[in-house]
Amino acid sequence: MFNNKKFIYLLCMSFSLLINIKAQTFSNETFIIETTFGQIKLKLYEETPVHKANFKKLVLNRFFDSLLFHRVINQFMIQGGDQLSKYSNTGDSLGHGDIGYTLTSEINPKLIHKKGALCAAREGDDINPKFESSASQFYIVMGKSRTLEDLKKYEDRINKTHYNNCAREFIKSKQGRALKQQYNRLTNENKLDSAYIINSLIENSTKIEYLKTSEYHFNQKQINLYTTIGGTPHLDNTYTVFGEVTEGIEIIVVYKFICF
């Protein structure tokens, strides 16, 4: 049986070659995660400067030294960066540690959750509708290959998430609060026909906001990647992807065999 503690040491070193590809531009540093099973090498994206600068700062300050991959979900991802994991014991609940600030979302449609993607963890949509990122917790996508039917379901889920966020934002507005209060009052008074009319007004206003942006659909590049090497496509457009594994992807695969 493997020991529960999987140590992570992140070191930054100079890398002389700047690599350019169509989808994204790599920064000129390589970040190395030293694990029990070997090295994982990362490159960060120039398209996400806030996340890149923050990650580099934490590495140089040795924040990640001896932290754990505290969350491992087979065919999904491995997650680390919780400062509470440094001195944790077997069975401790982890994943709630933070460092007092969040990062503005840098979601970019070109940067996707393919296998090996480095992404920022965050709080859920209900309390974080702007998709702000955790400053320290990150995950690396493990994922699996998907079918075209899977991708259609994920498109629907992403669009539903956007619709729900539009609804929450409308209810926070002055007009939305007034309509919601009116709806609640009519419901309590059992005036259901009138309540239905008010609810229709709320839904129509939400749809107007929702339709201000185009519905989300995977492009051909995403389809090709997700149906071959795989990933977690349902997280696209909702979490910030700010880098990727360039060497050592096989180390991530090893973690799927570990039981916590």
Task: Give the label of every model feature segment.
Residues 21-260:
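Cyclophilin-like peptidyl-prolyl cis-trans isomerases
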